[in-house]
């Protein structure tokens, strides 16, 4: 049914994915100086993040893999992978907020973090397109439900008196379902591809930034070692020469200098080391933010691939019911048989649509929790002011919540409004 109506499929993602893979392979060929495993061992917080990430990703991958084995991916798998995606996004927000002052001091890293959160705008567009598709699917579901109800609950006397009118009415409703076409339209797949391309682009930016940070960290470690050795050696040599000169000119002064000779060396060494350590700590903070965004983006790409497969699975169900409608168009006996087939498949279709709708609601609710934290992150107190993208995100999110009473009464929505109000006051 989907191919007959000319609905755009996300096949173009394959070429984009191949190009991105080739780019990543080229980057890998250069070799990354840093070791993620070593970083996890050295940094307890990063190790905890990695453990939680692996657990979430493993659960999502297992859910999808179990569906692949039986050639049937359920909406439960969709809930698992999208839940993993949004949990990862919240974790990234937590890491970024913890390092926000270091991020503000680095314009490049600030822009990178802002690009990452601007991806939430594309996610909102994707969820809005999904919501429209679900409304169309529910409308089609209602048409089929009415056709089945009329055919099976018509009084026997009325059915005998006007059988032809009954079949004509039923057939008309079945044709109305067929004419509605695919609920997943070009808009849905366009929004999907926009999110996917943005995530793939983010991967490239994060990898390049991480390599630069790795090189700087390696250099800073060498600087601390070499500068410490050279500086302290030179300082010690100066003290030795001073003591020698004093010994020649005034032996009692040399005797007094000898016990205190190590004190200035230690103080100077601590001073030099503290300067380099501050720089190294700042680089570590930057790298932690980049690593969190890099892992979150990678998981997002895998989850989007899984969502695409699950949407195609739902389309197969719709196409199967459309085939039953086509069969019912042959004659009155075929109408009766076609209605029975549609009734069998309608229950599964209704459950799939309802489950997908519930998942979309949960995704929106989680975004209600993520975006206020982003508002606090891009706080005008940092001197950069509020960007147009932030206002756009706030307005888009407000419009989505305003249209649904469930969101308007949720504490997430109220939290978002409170955060937005504080930002507007700060700007004014």
UniProtKB/Swiss-Prot annotation:
Subcellular location: Membrane
Listed Pfam families: DUF677
Chief location bin: membrane
Keyword tags: Membrane, Transmembrane, Transmembrane helix
Biased composition (Acidic residues): 22-31
Membrane topology: Multi-pass membrane protein
Stretches the record annotates as Disordered: 1-40
GO cellular component terms attached to this protein's record: membrane
Membrane spanning residue stretches: 229-249, 252-272
Domain of life: Eukaryota
Composition bias type Basic residues, residue spans: 1-14
UniProt cross-references to PANTHER family, sorted A to Z: UPF0496 PROTEIN 3-RELATED, UPF0496 PROTEIN 5-RELATED
Protein name stated in the entry: Putative UPF0496 protein 5
């Amino acid at each position: 049914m989907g191919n007959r109506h000319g609905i755009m499929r996300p096949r173009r993602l394959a070429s984009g994915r191949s190009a991105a893979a080739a780019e990543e392979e080229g980057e890998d060929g250069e070799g990354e100086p840093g070791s993620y495993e070593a970083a996890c061992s050295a940094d307890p917080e990063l190790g905890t993040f990695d453990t939680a990430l692996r657990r979430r990703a493993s659960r999502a991958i297992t859910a999808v893999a179990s569906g692949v084995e039986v050639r049937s991916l359920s909406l439960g798998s969709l809930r698992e992978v999208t839940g993993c995606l949004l949990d990862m996004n919240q974790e990234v927000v937590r890491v970024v907020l913890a390092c926000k002052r270091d991020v503000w001091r680095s314009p490049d890293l600030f822009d990178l973090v802002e690009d990452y959160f601007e991806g939430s705008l594309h996610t909102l567009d994707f969820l809005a397109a999904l919501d429209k598709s679900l409304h169309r699917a529910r409308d089609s579901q209602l048409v089929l439900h009415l056709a089945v109800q009329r055919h099976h609950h018509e009084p026997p006397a009325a059915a005998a008196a006007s059988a032809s009118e009954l079949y004509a009415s039923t057939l008309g409703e079945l044709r109305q379902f067929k004419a509605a076409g695919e609920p997943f339209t070009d808009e849905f797949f366009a929004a999907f591809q926009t999110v996917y391309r943005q995530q793939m682009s983010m991967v490239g930016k994060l990898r390049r930034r991480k390599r630069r940070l790795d090189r700087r960290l390696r250099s800073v470690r060498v600087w601390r070692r070499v500068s410490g050795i050279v500086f302290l050696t030179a300082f010690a040599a100066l003290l030795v020469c001073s003591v020698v000169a004093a010994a020649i000119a005034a032996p009692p002064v040399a005797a007094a200098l000898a016990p205190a000779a190590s004190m200035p060396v230690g103080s100077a060494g601590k001073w030099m080391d503290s300067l380099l350590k501050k720089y190294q700590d700042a680089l570590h903070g930057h790298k932690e933010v980049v690593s969190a965004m890099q892992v979150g983006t990678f998981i997002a790409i895998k989850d989007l691939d899984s969502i695409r497969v699950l949407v195609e699975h739902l389309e197969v169900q719709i196409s199967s019911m459309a085939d039953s409608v086509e069969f019912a168009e042959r004659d009155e006996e075929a109408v009766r048989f076609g209605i029975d087939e549609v009734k069998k498949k309608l229950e599964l279709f209704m459950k799939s649509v309802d489950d997908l709708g519930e998942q979309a609601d949960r995704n929106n609710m989680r975004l209600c929790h993520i975006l206020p934290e982003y508002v606090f992150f891009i706080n005008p107190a940092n001197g950069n002011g509020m960007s147009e993208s932030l206002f756009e995100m706030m307005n888009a999110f407000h419009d989505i919540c305003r249209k649904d009473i469930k969101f308007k009464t949720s504490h997430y929505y109220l939290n978002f409004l409170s955060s937005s109000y504080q930002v507007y006051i700060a700007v004014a």
